[in-house]
Amino acid sequence: QRQMCIRDSNNWDNKAARWNEPIANNPEFCESILDRIRRCVIRDKNRASVVIWSMGNESAYGVTFEEALAWVKSYDSYRLTHYESAQYTDGKRKYDYSNLDLYSRMYPSISEMAEYIDGDGDKPYILCEYCHAMGNGPGDLEDYFQFFDSHETTCGGFVWEWCDHAIYTV
């Protein structure tokens, strides 16, 4: 059975994950990031279709997001959390992933997903972006569906930009 659920993401999106580590690990940015996440969660807390809170997009990981995740879990412990950029760390300290419920990736191959699941992956696996729906981009879904259906620790995925961006003419 397929269904449509929403992963709600705040507007913290830097498109340069590895280069944003100084922001993600800088306590001076905690309030700025927390403010965006707080506004998103409070705005959409009563929307039943929202099943996952996302901390943002491609913006590295550090103390700023650890604090934001702690706030989200204290405010709404019922919904799941994910942050794909949690993998982008500087390796200089031990990171806290305790408030992340899901391990998420963008556009992984089937073999990459299998490697995580068959290895020491300790969180359910979800594709936070896949099947980019631009032009004739959305393809190969059947292979992903078969993989999801055959592995209990996968949660499916979220189609990125669920619409074509072609120009509409009358």
Regions found by a protein language model. Give the residues of each.
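Substrate-binding/catalytic cleft of secreted carbohydrate-active enzymes
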Residues: 3, 7-170
